[in-house]
Amino acid sequence: MSISDEEAEISESEIEDYSETPYRLLRDGTYKVKVNGQLRCPFCAGKKKQDYKYKELYAHATGVSKGSATRSALQKANHLALAMFLENELAGYAEPVPRPPVVPPQLDETEPNPHNVYVWPWMGIVVNPLKEADDKELLLDSAYWLQTLSKFKPIEVNAFWVEQDSIVGVIAKFNGDWSGFAGATELEKEFETQGSSKKEWTERSGDSESKAYGWCARADDFESQGPIGEYLSKEGQLRTVSDISQKNVQDRNTVLEELSDMIAMTNEDLNKVQYSYNRTAMSLQRVLDEKKNLHQAFADETKKMQQMSLRHIQKILYDKEKLSNELDRKMRDLESRAKQLEKHEALTELDRQKLDEDKRKSDAMNKSLQLASREQKKADESVLRLVEEHQRQKEDALNKILLLEKQLDTKQTLEMEIQELKGKLQVMKHLGDDDDEAVQKKMKEMNDELDDKKAELEGLESMNSVLMTKERQSNDEIQAARKKLIAGLTGLLGAETDIGVKRMGELDEKPFLDVCKLRYSANEAAVEAATLCSTWQENLKNPSWQPFKHEGTGDGAEEVVDEDDEQLKKLKREWGKEVHNAVKTALVEMNEYNASGRYTTPELWNFKEGRKATLKEVITFISNDIKILKRKRT
C-alpha cells in the first residue's frame, strides 16, 4: 500500500491509533532520531533544518501533531508517535529550564524579626516639636525633609501639622523591596545613635528641646490616632517579614514561569516560521523544475517545427526542379521535331503546305511553351518569396515567443527571489536581536535587495504589458481574418471537403437518422429523425438546462457533461448511445464556444482530423485545392 493510499484511509479520529505503528518503528530503530549524536526528525527529511535540540524537536513534533488543516492525517500520526518516543525513550536528552536560585535576602544586622509587624511599603516616621524660635513654614515643607533625609533614599516625603501636640509629623516612604527596608532601618538607627529614637520620644518629659525624633513605622503607629495614623492606614498595610519574603518568592517564581512559557511559545512560533519557509522553498523549487521542463518541451517542439519547415521547403524545391526538367524535355522534343520537318522541305506543294502548317503549329506550341516556361519561372520565384516570407514570419513568431518566455522566466525568478527574501527576513526578525548591529545591517541589506528586486519586477511587468498588448493586437487581427474567412467560405465549403465551416453546437443528424431507420419505415424515418433532431436542438438552446458538473480543484478544475443528468439518461435509454453521444458532443461544443447565449457558432474546421483548422491550413487549402474543386463543379 502506498503512502498516498494510507493517507486516504486515515481519518482525524484514527490518528492516535495509527501512531502506534510509527512508534514501534521508532523503537525498533527503523526510523533514526539520533544520527551522529544529533537529534533529527525522520519524517521531515526534505527540510533545510535537520539538527534539533531536544526541546526544539519536541516542540516541532507536538506542533505538527496538533497542526493546521494543511497537515495530512498521516503526518500528524507520525509526529504524534515522535513526540511520545521523545517523552518515553529520550527524556534524558531534555535540557533543564535554567532557573536562577531563589536567594533569601541577606540583611545582616538590619534583618528584622520575622514575626514583627511593619507597615508596608516600608515607611519611616520623623516628629519635630515646634518651638517659637522654629520656622514652622520651613518644617512643614516636604521638599526640605526630602533633602534632609536624602541619604536614606526615600521615594516620597510628606509633612503634617499635628495641632494637638504642636508638632510637625513627617512620613518618609521607601521602596517595597529589601533596599527600602534597609533605608528605613538606617533612618531608625541614625536617630537611635543621636538619642532621638521612638523610645526617647515616648519617654520625653515637659518641654523638651526642639529636635527631630525618628523610627521605622510599625503596627502601633499604623493603629494610632491623628494625621500620621490616618496616612499610614491609607497608604500602607501591616505585614510580617515572613509574609513579605514569601510573597517576593512567589512573585519571582511567577515571573520565571511566565518567561519560560514565553520562551517555549517563541520557539514554537519560530519552528512554525521555519516550517513555512521550508515549505515555500520546496514549492519554489517545484516551480523551477516545472519551468525547466516546460522550457525543454518548448525547445523540442521548436526544433520539430523547424525540421518540418525544412522538409517542406525541400519538397517545394524538388517539385520545382522536376517541373523544370519536364519543360526542358518538351523543348528538346520540339527542337527535334523541327529538324525533322526541315528535312521534308523538298516534298510536294501539298506536303510543303502541310509542313508549313505543322511548322506554324509547332512555332505556336513553342511560343506557348516558352510563355509557360516564363510563367513557371515567375511562379517559382513567387513560391520562393512565399517560402522566405513564411520562414521570416515563423522566425518572428518564434522570437516573440522566446522573448515572452524569457520575460516570463525572469519575472517568475524575480518573484521567487522576492518570496525567498521575505522568508529570510521573517526568520531574521524572529532570530535576531534589535540591538545586534550585524543583524540590523544584514536586515537592511536584505530590505534594500528586496526593494531592488521589486523595482526590477515592476520594470519587467511594464515591458511584459507592452508585449502582451502587441500580442493581443496580433490575436485581434487573426480573429478578424478568421471571421472574414468564415463569412466568405460559408456555403461554399462543407463537411464534404477536408477544410470547411462547421456550426459548433449543431447536432449531427446522421445518428438520429440511423436509429430511426431501425424503428420506422424508409419514408417515416427521415421525418421522425428530423423532428427528433429539431426537438433536441431546441433543448440545447434552453439556458435553464445546465447538464454540467465541475471536476478537479483549483486551477485544474474543469466543467464536463454530467452523465447523471436525468434528461441525458432518459435520452440514452430511449434512443441509444449514438444519439446520446451526438447530443453530448453538441453540448460540449456549445458550452465551449457560446455558454451564455446557447446558440450555434460558425468555426473554421478541419473535417479530416476532426479539429479546429488553423489559418495556415485554410489558406493552403484555398490556394491548392479550391481550383480542383471548381473544375469538378464545372
UniProtKB/Swiss-Prot annotation:
Pfam families in the record: XH, XS, zf-XS
Compositional bias (Basic and acidic residues): 349-364
Tissue specificity of this protein: Highly expressed in flowers and at lower levels in roots, leaves and stems.
Transmembrane segment boundaries: none
Keyword Cell cycle in record: no
Record note on disruption phenotype: No visible phenotype under normal growth conditions. The double mutants idnl1-1 and idnl2-1 show a late-flowering phenotype and reduced level of DNA methylation. The double mutants fdm1-1 and fdm2-1 show reduced level of DNA methylation and repeat-associated small interfering RNAs (ra-siRNAs).
One GO location term (cellular component): plasmodesma
GO molecular function: DNA binding; double-stranded RNA binding; RNA binding
Stretches the record annotates as Disordered: 349-375
GO BP annotations listed: gene silencing by siRNA-directed DNA methylation; regulation of double-strand break repair via homologous recombination
InterPro entries, per database record: FDM1-5/IDN2, FDM1-5/IDN2_XH, XS_domain, XS_domain_sf, Znf-XS_domain
Parts forming coiled coils: 288-469
Domain of life where this protein originates: Eukaryota
Gene3D superfamilies in the record: XS domain (3.30.70.2890)
Keywords assigned by UniProt, alphabetized: Coiled coil, DNA-binding, RNA-binding, RNA-mediated gene silencing
Subunit text: Homodimer. Interacts with IDN2 and AGO4. Forms a complex with IDN2 and FMD2/INDL2.
Function: Forms a complex with IDN2 and FDM2/IDNL2 that is required for RNA-directed DNA methylation (RdDM) and that functions at a downstream step of the RdDM pathway. Required for de novo DNA methylation and 24 nucleotide small interfering RNA (siRNA) accumulation. Binds unmethylated but not methylated DNAs through its coiled-coil domain. May bind double-stranded RNAs (dsRNAs) with 5'-overhangs through its XS domain. However, according to, FMD1 does not bind dsRNAs.
Protein's recorded name: Factor of DNA methylation 1
Native source organism of the sequence: Arabidopsis thaliana (Mouse-ear cress)
Lineage: Eukaryota, Viridiplantae, Streptophyta, Embryophyta, Tracheophyta
